[in-house]
Amino acid sequence: MGNDMIQVAGRPFSLESTTDFGRVERAILQQMLDSSEWFSYSSMNELRFELNVRINIMESAKEMNASQVTFTIFEHASCNPEYWTLTSTGGFLVRSDVRPSDAILDIYRNGTLYGFECATAIIIIYYQAILKSIGQLRFDSIFQHLYLYSWHTHPGLELHTFHADRFLPGDVVYFNNPDFHPDTPWFRGENAVVLSDGTFFGHGFGIMTAEQMIQSLNSYRFPGSMQPAYLANLITRISPLTIRNLLTLQSDRTTYHYSKAVIHHNLCSISSMDYQYYLLSLNG
């Protein structure tokens, strides 16, 4: 692999030619250059913006770990009624009289009032990271009528999920536990943010190594299981188009006048790929 794995404005990117990236940014760039994946950016600003979003995803994951939000199933979900309406399916609908940015920030500020499962946690982390990256004014203009439920996202946030053997800091991976105990189906897996030091944050488990995450899930298998939990080769990222749109579109051009379908599957801790299958079955 080499410099041609990253292209900026149609030209190969060289890490040696730049000196103004921070330590974490340079580490991410080096992993991108060493991968078999091809990354293309229309400008250096777009590359810098994606790196900033990745760093903010990791920071938002750490902040969630430090908050007092709890892991729970959809039936027992909870939220602050001053900012969100709790739906009968365990989703959170932002109130029309509050700013979406304030509602997201409240999850971190008043964590004891909130309980949700790990897929919802990832989406909250994404929104918090985007808020850090673009500021409250643009966030509130784009992300109106937020609804939090599993992997459901606002039209302004599209995700890209794919199979690969290598991941980058700021990616989301999935620890699969196919032989989960039927009494605790919410331990069927764990969605986790890849941190820059090689550890992972998973809502409900905290910050752990891959081995620790697997051991934790293994303790929730059914008796006699011969299939241990494992780190799947499944990666989820904010889509390149979303990154580009968040960087380039002006706030007065980014109001979305449509909503996306929601699948209220009532299954905690599913992967993004599984949620996409449910969406396809709905549309199929």
Swiss-Prot record:
Membrane-crossing residue ranges in chain numbering: none
Domain of life: Bacteria
Main EC class the enzyme belongs to: transferase
Keyword Acyltransferase included in the entry's annotation: yes
GO BP of this protein: sporulation resulting in formation of a cellular spore
Catalytic reaction annotation: L-glutaminyl-[protein] + L-lysyl-[protein] = [protein]-L-lysyl-N(6)-5-L-glutamyl-[protein] + NH4(+)
Keywords of this entry: Acyltransferase, Sporulation, Transferase
UniProt-listed Enzyme Commission number(s): 2.3.2.13
GO terms of molecular function: protein-glutamine gamma-glutamyltransferase activity
Family label: Belongs to the bacillus TGase family.
NCBIfam families in the record: PRK03187.1
Function: Probably plays a role in the assembly of the spore coat proteins by catalyzing epsilon-(gamma-glutamyl)lysine cross-links.
Name of this protein: Protein-glutamine gamma-glutamyltransferase
Gene name for this UniProt entry: tgl
